[in-house]
């Protein structure tokens, strides 16, 4: 992918102070419902990212409380049900074997990663989710978090310091305060704000189809703008590096059967490789240059 191609299809997806809208996305890295939101968020950013900046707000206390109260077996079963319903694989095997040691640490690590930039935080969050839900790694353990930081090409020494710093603690406390003030009781929750309009934002709690989020965005914009061009499939895979068949289906308005046909063509051309998950399928882009570090794809 050339820089011009990247700019043409993806530059508008990043944060910019002149965008009229901001979306607060309240998440917990341990929440399978937040993981299930990935396809809709990808599509919204690709089609209308020129209008909004996405701000990640950690709401760890909500999921942490549920993790501590519910029996491991029941929690694992809930993960499996969410995977079957959403199409985003969640393997609850880890929860049968052990309890997550320090649920808050995953959100603290997210804030530590964000100290190296908003984009770094988003990449770190995605990699945490892949590690937990696909690879059954305990992202509440520091060694796992350090491996994720290295994989997402953060400054590792800086991340180690920040993970134990007051800066990360204060950032997390600020997020929890925002969640309390906005009466966020569960994750995921998206709150849409328009800087050009007075009044409170619109809050959407729960996991819905892409069309619901698009409708709320239009309502807050007061307009139904034309969507940005969706990138060709190969460029999409190259940019994100590791994606679920469900994500492709949502972004391109395809059935899973159509996704399978199109991805087989790329696999035959040795552009991608298939990665089977417990529920569904993922696809990894094959980098021509091995030193071209991947954006995502956290492996075991």
Curated annotation (Swiss-Prot):
Record bears the keyword Cytoplasm: yes
Pfam families per UniProt: Thioredoxin_5 (PF13743)
Keywords: Cytoplasm
Keyword Cytoplasm: yes
UniProt superkingdom: Bacteria
Compartment(s): Cytoplasm
Transmembrane domains' residue ranges: none
Subunit-level organization: Interacts with Spx.
Family per record: Belongs to the SpxH family.
PANTHER family associated with the record: CLPXP ADAPTER PROTEIN SPXH (PTHR13887:SF47), GLUTATHIONE S-TRANSFERASE KAPPA (PTHR13887)
Protein name listed in UniProt: ClpXP adapter protein SpxH
């Amino acid at each position: 992918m050339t820089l011009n191609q990247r700019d043409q299809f993806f530059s508008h997806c990043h944060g910019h102070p002149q965008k009229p809208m901001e979306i607060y996305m309240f998440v917990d890295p341990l929440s399978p419902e937040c993981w299930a939101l990935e396809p809709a968020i990808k599509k919204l950013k690709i089609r209308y990212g020129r209008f909004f900046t996405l701000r990640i707000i950690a709401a760890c206390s909500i999921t942490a409380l549920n993790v501590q109260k519910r029996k491991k077996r029941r929690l694992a079963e809930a993960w499996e049900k969410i995977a079957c319903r959403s199409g985003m694989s969640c393997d609850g095997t880890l929860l049968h074997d052990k309890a997550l040691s320090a649920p808050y640490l995953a959100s603290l690590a997210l804030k530590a990663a964000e100290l190296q930039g908003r984009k770094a935080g988003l990449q770190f969050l995605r990699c945490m989710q892949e590690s937990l839900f696909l690879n059954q790694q305990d992202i509440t353990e520091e060694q796992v978090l350090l491996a994720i930081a290295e994989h997402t090409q953060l400054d590792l020494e800086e991340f180690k310091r920040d993970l134990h710093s007051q800066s990360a603690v204060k950032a997390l406390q600020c997020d929890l305060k925002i969640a309390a003030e906005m009466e966020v009781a569960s994750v995921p929750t998206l709150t849409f704000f328009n800087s050009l309009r007075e009044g409170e934002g619109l809050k959407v709690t729960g996991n819905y189809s892409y069309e619901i989020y698009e409708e709320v965005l239009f309502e807050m914009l007061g307009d139904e703008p034309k969507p940005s061009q969706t990138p060709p499939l190969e460029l999409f895979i190259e940019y994100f590096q590791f994606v679920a068949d469900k994500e492709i289906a949502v972004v391109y308005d395809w059935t899973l059967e159509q996704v399978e046909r199109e991805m087989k063509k790329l696999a035959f051309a040795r552009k991608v490789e298939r990665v089977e998950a417990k529920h569904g399928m993922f696809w990894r882009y094959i980098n021509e240059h091995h030193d071209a570090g991947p954006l995502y794809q956290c492996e075991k």
